[in-house]
Regions:
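N-terminal ligand-binding/catalytic initiation module
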Residues: 1-127
Length: 127
């Protein structure tokens, strides 16, 4: 199997993982900022990042923002976010199926949705 998942320790975040699948070209970071109110809820952004650091910074910033948004809305969800680096890659069903495999490894701690450049049709590939 070509899926590789590495956990990244970041102070103030419950879990941050970086997942690579060489076969499907997946390069994603999922950041779970906080699950005190419930599982982390946040979208997956498909974006062209120039570097790993830029991608990670975006995931961290956005997942913390989702914690605040979900809390302000008084819903029972924490905050999380996923970002997929699509620089030089095609968005394919296999890419999003591979992303779904990564989400499943979090065992319900992160719930995904659409976000910038990730559409319903892309997420239909995850089911």
């Amino acid at each position: 199997m070509s899926l590789k998942i590495n956990e990244i320790s970041v102070k103030g975040y419950e879990k941050v993982i970086h997942a690579i699948n060489e076969t499907t070209k997946l390069d994603c970071i999922i950041s779970v900022h906080n699950t005190k109110l419930g599982p982390a809820l946040g979208g997956v952004r498909s974006w062209s990042y120039n570097s790993f650091d830029e991608q990670k910074t975006d995931a961290l910033r956005l997942s913390e923002a989702m914690t605040l948004k979900n809390s302000i809305c008084r819903i029972n969800f924490g905050g999380g976010k996923a970002v997929i680096n699509i620089r030089g890659k095609n968005k394919t069903p296999e890419l999003y199926q591979s992303y779904a495999e990564v989400v499943e490894t979090l065992k319900g701690d992160y719930l995904t949705a659409g976000d910038v450049n990730t559409f319903k049709e892309d997420l239909m590939e995850c089911s």
